[in-house]
């Protein structure tokens, strides 16, 4: 059974009163690709082995738990955060193939795209890594390449998307009200999820090391994509408050999380201590 955790870094940013953990595998660390609105469509998936790999990769990403049960430790799938099969602008996979390898501060190394995928399996899926040279990883990366058709290779610029959230202070009581009014109908009153929406806290959700466990990352995702039936209707403060409320609940721990950001300077909304920032 997963260990539930409510890690807190003492003395950090006021919003992190008891924040625990979209993986999600979110894209907080990546620049927005210019081609996000023009993802390649089904009509141009070719016949033959390449097209078969594209379709299988998409199937693995949209039915991750059913397709790869040995590697998924919760009730999420990759497209729980990367909506519209990875085509939605906030969380898009369009262009991601062209941005790797890239240096990422969380690991402190230059990551390949296979490493990044496996990081999501460990964190957002609370599971285990795929064989980086195996057929499952090959087909997932092939789908990314297909979506990135026509996107030029360029260095990944540091993202500025999360900077605006630095000015916000969370009110988790207000977040609870937003959750009850706008989120519980899909995600459950206790965050347990429903048949059509993933759990957002508890043993079956993403773990404390997932990108979505960061309040700023979650607020950015929520502000663009939620509620699912009326995206973009929440005010920024409401998105921030509900992100803090969701992440104030227990969720699975991540072994080795203290080794994140090995060169220091973790983002201020990381809810757990690291070896370089206790």
Spans of model-derived segments:
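N-terminal secretory signal peptides that target proteins for export/translocation
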Residues: 1-9
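C-terminal motif of bacterial Sec signal peptides marking the signal peptidase cleavage site
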Residues: 21-24
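Flexible coil segments in periplasmic/lumen-exposed cytochrome c-class electron-transfer proteins
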Residues: 26-38, 75, 100-101, 107, ...
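Sequence/structural segment immediately N-terminal to covalent heme-attachment motifs in c-type
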Residues: 49-85, 166-197, 215-217
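Sec/Tat-exported extracytoplasmic proteins
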Residues: 61-68, 82-85, 121-128, 144-151, ...
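Gly/Gly-Pro-rich "capping" loops immediately C-terminal to redox-active cysteine motifs
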Residues: 42-43, 69-118, 192-227
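Post-signal peptide N-terminal segment of mature Sec-exported envelope proteins
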Residues: 32-52
């Amino acid at each position: 059974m997963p260990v539930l955790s409510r890690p807190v870094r003492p003395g950090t940013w006021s919003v992190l009163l008891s924040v625990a953990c979209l993986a999600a595998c979110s894209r907080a660390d990546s620049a927005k690709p210019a081609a996000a609105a023009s993802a390649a469509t089904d009509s141009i998936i070719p016949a033959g082995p390449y097209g078969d790999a594209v379709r299988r990769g998409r199937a693995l990403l949209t039915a991750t738990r059913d397709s790869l049960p040995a590697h998924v430790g919760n009730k999420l799938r990759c497209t729980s955060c990367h909506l519209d099969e990875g085509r939605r602008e906030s969380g898009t996979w369009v262009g991601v193939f062209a941005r790797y390898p890239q240096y990422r501060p969380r690991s402190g190394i230059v990551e390949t795209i296979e490493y990044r995928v496996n990081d999501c399996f460990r964190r957002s899926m609370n599971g285990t890594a795929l064989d980086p040279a195996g057929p499952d990883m090959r087909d997932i990366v092939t789908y990314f390449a297909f979506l990135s058709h026509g996107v030029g290779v360029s260095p990944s610029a540091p993202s500025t998307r999360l900077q605006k959230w630095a000015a916000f202070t969370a009110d988790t009581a207000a977040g609870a009200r937003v959750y009850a009014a706008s989120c519980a109908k899909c995600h459950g009153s206790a965050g347990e999820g429903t048949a059509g929406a993933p759990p957002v806290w508890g043993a079956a959700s993403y773990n404390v090391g997932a990108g979505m466990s960061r309040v700023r990352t979650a607020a950015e995702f929520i502000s663009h994509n939620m509620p699912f039936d009326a995206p973009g209707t929440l005010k920024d403060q409401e998105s921030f408050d509900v992100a803090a409320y969701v992440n104030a609940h227990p969720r699975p721990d991540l072994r080795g999380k203290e080794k994140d950001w090995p060169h220091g300077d973790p983002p201020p909304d990381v809810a757990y201590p690291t070896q370089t920032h206790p």
